[in-house]
Amino acid sequence: MANLKAVFLICIVAFIALQCVVAEPAAEDSVVVKRSIGSALKKALPVAKKIGKIALPIAKAALPVAAGLVG
């Protein structure tokens, strides 16, 4: 289940970082882009941790139900 939490964290961080980098940056914009990604990561990590704490119990409860449906 720790892997599930890590996947949520990575997806949320990647989504927010992608929103900061809409177009391919020019060489002079690289510093601005790096700062944008850095600030997005700093803001995304606490949010992702909160979502992971909420989603993990839901996933644990849904897993036996899904396993019963599949097998």
Curated annotation (Swiss-Prot):
Female-specific peptides with potent activity against Gram-positive and Gram-negative bacteria. They have as well hemolytic activity. Thermostable. Still active at 100 degrees Celsius. Residues 1-23 form the signal peptide. This is Ceratotoxin-A. It is found in: Secreted. GO terms for biological process: defense response to bacterium; innate immune response; killing of cells of another organism. The keyword Nucleotide-binding does not apply. GO terms for cellular component: extracellular region. Disulfide bonds: none annotated.
